[in-house]
Amino acid sequence: MYCPFCRNPDSRVVDSRMADDGSSIRRRRQCPECGRRFTTVETTSLSVIKRSGVGEPFSRIKVISGVRKACQGRPVTEDDLAMLAQEVEENIRSSGAAEIDAHEVGLAILGPLRKLDEVAYLRFASVYQAFESLEDFESAISLLRHEAEAAKAGAKKATGSEKSQL
């Protein structure tokens, strides 16, 4: 690592810490030549392979801009979108892959978006999964309803078992 002050090609690591919720490492370094200290932040690279075969770095900003249109007119804040993008990136990085298809990024967006706002999820899924008919929308909506009912039934069972234990 070159010193940014004197361009000496050597430096010593003084301190290392996790940063950005564990997705990067912050290192405090000292130059043995000039004695000045500087900070570096190291992250693993994550490339998205587009349909054309061209790779580009993963971007939370692109995730947010892709989802923002689906969230227009919905009670979704910029903070919500930032948290969604962070969750998507964490899910992708947890797979351990250095490269991921753009299609997989879209799939990784669907889950967190569904938890955030079901209408925005339907809007995004209709474009991403290329809904072609009303039946496509109806099947997606019925799946959402079925899962919501199953979640309610599970919650009722859990509260019922808690009451019986009292």
UniProtKB/Swiss-Prot annotation:
GO biological process terms, semicolon-separated: negative regulation of DNA-templated transcription
UniProt KW keywords: ATP-binding, DNA-binding, Metal-binding, Nucleotide-binding, Repressor, Transcription, Transcription regulation, Zinc, Zinc-finger
PROSITE patterns assigned: ATP_CONE (PS51161)
Top-level taxon of origin: Bacteria
Zn finger (unnamed) location: 3-34
Role played: Negatively regulates transcription of bacterial ribonucleotide reductase nrd genes and operons by binding to NrdR-boxes.
PANTHER family attached to this UniProt entry: TRANSCRIPTIONAL REPRESSOR NRDR (PTHR30455:SF2)
Annotated protein name in UniProt: Transcriptional repressor NrdR
Organism: Paenarthrobacter aurescens (strain TC1)
Upper taxonomic lineage: Bacteria, Bacillati, Actinomycetota, Actinomycetes, Micrococcales
Gene: nrdR
